[in-house]
């Protein structure tokens, strides 16, 4: 059965409509600001679901409290699904004295949970920091199906070579061609982009990445595709970690911006619930 933390409540209606069993939990705040959780119901196994978007630290502490409460109730096997995993980009030391933040969080969660599932984690290598079983879940199928009719016989592009595997996964769902943008610095302040080995003229194009934050790269890529004669331009990502004004900037530059609902946003039109149901 599922237990939904405060970062997973937006999945509840769809999960219930699919017939999933959901364990009741009370989550509130003490007058001094500390978090209170109480698990209602009993069982042997539970799958806790909660994204750790803002306020990230609060949601991480909540997951620890939920894990402790479930153990106290006698649950023997606990899975944790964190669709968006905070601190995933803090995966290395760049200055002396810094922590590897993603490692610290994973080790703490590993005290209570045997299995961890993350959707499209920024760096899959960090999964080794979790003491138990850790899995990177691909949203390629749900993203691909959402854009199937819109793209037709178009193509899928990654904004850079590092995201090429993501574009390949979505393209394989659709049976389409895929490639990536190559960046070349032509001055200290200017970077040139171009798609590698594909002709976009007259085609519908989907640009896909793991995270959109400021949206600057997506806007520049879309502007270039317009100049190259692309027909319709779509942008998607697993996680919409949008900085202020980013949704508006990207939306103005493309025909549609649609991300998954690992984080609830106004453009979270692609549901990961079909993938969540496989993890119960």
From Swiss-Prot:
The keyword Signal does not apply. It comes from the Archaea. GO terms for biological process: 5-phosphoribose 1-diphosphate biosynthetic process; purine nucleotide biosynthetic process. SMART domains: Pribosyltran_N. Optimum pH is 7. The active site is at 183. Mg(2+) 1 binds at residue 122. Mg(2+) 2 binds at residue 160. It is found in: Cytoplasm. Coiled coil: none annotated. GO terms for cellular component: cytoplasm; ribose phosphate diphosphokinase complex. Activated by Co(2+) and Ni(2+) ions, however Mg(2+) ion shows almost no significant effect on the activity. Equally inhibited by ADP, CTP and GTP, while dTTP and UTP are less inhibitory. Pathway: Metabolic intermediate biosynthesis; 5-phospho-alpha-D-ribose 1-diphosphate biosynthesis; 5-phospho-alpha-D-ribose 1-diphosphate from D-ribose 5-phosphate (route I): step 1/1. Disulfide bonds: none annotated. Its EC number is 2.7.6.1. Binds 2 Mg(2+) ions per subunit. Its cofactor is Mg(2+). ATP binds at residues 32-34, 89-90. Involved in the biosynthesis of the central metabolite phospho-alpha-D-ribosyl-1-pyrophosphate (PRPP) via the transfer of pyrophosphoryl group from ATP to 1-hydroxyl of ribose-5-phosphate (Rib-5-P). It can also use CTP and GTP as substrates in addition to ATP. This is Ribose-phosphate pyrophosphokinase. It comes from Thermococcus kodakarensis (strain ATCC BAA-918 / JCM 12380 / KOD1).
